[in-house]
Structures are given as structure tokens and as C-alpha cells.
Amino acid sequence: LGFGKPLPTAAAITEEGFMSCFSPNTTAAGNRLWCEVSAVVYDGKKLLFANDKDAPAGQSSVFSRNLIQLADTARPTYLMVPPYVAAHKYEDFARTPDGRFVLLTTAFDRVKPGSTDWDGYNTLLYWRTGDEAHPHVLTTDDATSASLGIRQHLASILANDVFPGNMPYFKIEGLAATDDKLFFGVREEGKSYSDFTHRTKIISVSYRIERKGNQERIRLSDDWKLIADFNPARTHPELPRPLALSSLEYDPYHQCFWLLTSLEANGHLDAYLWVIKPEDLYTNKPFTLITNVVGKPLHLGHKAEDLTPLDHQRLLLIHDDDRVQTTIGKRTRQSNQAAYSILSIH
């Protein structure tokens, strides 16, 4: 993987705009609904998006658009099959390097002991590329309808001296896939959703494809490992803090991993892009900060949430600016819109 290939080091924002998730002024339970897109993937033919908020009746948190219609205001195509509606708080897509499978993870950030009420927050879906109408739930055993076994592995891998046994609270915001491994990116960990530390930690697990007749299933191994614990402030103390992981992707074009880190403080949004070779990630080396063409850190004035390679040259970044009315040029974000950026990489 990627030995000897020079890494991209710089990028330029070549296009920015707003995309629509639903009609303007859409409401749910009497409140105005905001488009809070947290995940994007280009599957080779179209873009798939996922929102980290539930959608109103008749719509879905997961939807698709053609790349050429990215900035179009027309209604997107909603994915309405039950598994998409049953899961909540989507955070990141991944695509296998051979392009055969797409995966989509939730945050794994809450569980209700003795109840199935919150199982939807602990769900990892996958499907054959182009067949998103038939998603499977990735489980550690065939008996469950959610991915709770995955949550248990993540919680025990994150255990430390303060929280031995299991990390009580954590939030997954990154998911990446190589030919034989999945990578989970951790943004938050701690005692609870109101008492946590921002992190950029990465956990790996091996997988294989099992074929039965014309069915293909992803099966996980039992070799869960915490492979990286990156602190952006240590490598770049001049950047705002606390920056934490908001996306992790493997790029088959450059055989590297991309990392997005973001922060939101007092309505002020910042994000930065980083890159690393696989062999450096596996040995917990620091990521390299991507600069602009004049060598300064490439700064995005948004809460960049996910990215996807479009081709050898371009990355598409999607921003979940929560309810902040960010601007692009003279345009201001409306509640049904999410900002995006296309970067050309050098």
C-alpha cells in the first residue's frame, strides 16, 4: 500500500456552493428543519449523502444526487427502505478501494441498557455499489439487527486507566476501508456526552468477503486495535483548538488516508485537512497538514464533516454547519442547504 509514492501536500478550493437536502422551510414536529449533512460518498456514478438528524415523514436521512446536479435545487432521491429509516445519526461513508462496496456508519454514541430503543444509533450499513436499495447491517453475529457487537469492541479498545474495562461514552465520526481493513475514527470519548475529551483516535479491524450463492457478506475478524492517537496541537500549536477528527477516508488514487479535523466554538467554524501514508498511520506517526498553494495551512471556514475523492485530482468536502448561517461569496446558507467545497489537490 502506497510505498514510495509521493503524498499530495497542497490543495486549492476550486468550487464552493450550497446543496439542497429538502424543500425550503421544511418543518418537523413544528420546528424548522436544518440540513445537517454529515456524510458523503461518490460511488463512481452518483453522490450519496446522509444527514445526522432524522428526516420528516416521506423523506429519508440518506439521499442521492448526480454530481452535475450538486448545486441544483431539485428534490434529491431519498432512500426509503427500512434500514435507512431505522438508523439514526449518520456520520461517515466509506467505499472499498475496488469500488465494490459502500459502507455507512452511525455515531455509536449512545446505548440504553436493557432496551433496544437506541439500537439505531449503533448501526453500520453496507451494500454492493449501485444496489443501495438493499443494504445489510454489519454485525459481529447474525442474531442481531443492529451493530451493537461493534460498539462493545470499540468501547473496550478505548478503555484506559480512568475508565478501565469500557469507555462509557464515545462518538465515531470516521469510517475508512482498505482492501482488508476497516478503520473507525473517534472524535469524542469520556464519561458522557456532556463530559468528554476531543480526540483523533483510529481503531482498525480486518474484514473479509464471504460468498454464499449470489449473496456476499462482509465478515469482521477479531483483531481490533487502537492504531493511532493523533494530537493536532502537538504538531501544529498555531492552529485553533481543540481540533478533533470529523472524517477519515482512504484514497485509492493516491494510496493514502485523508483526515478532516474541525471545531465549532461560539458560532465560529474551522476545519483543516491532513494526509498520511498507510504505513505511517499503522505506526501512529503524525498526519501531515495540507497547505494552500502559498504554503499556509489550508483553512476551511466551515465544520467540514466528510470528504470523498471524485477522481485523481479532486476531493468533494461536505460541511455540517449545524444552524450557523455561513456565507459563500454573497450567498447565505438557508436552513434546507448544506455548504460544499471541491478541492483540487497537488
Indicate where each model-derived feature is located.
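Sequence/structural signature of beta-propeller domains
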Residues: 2-346
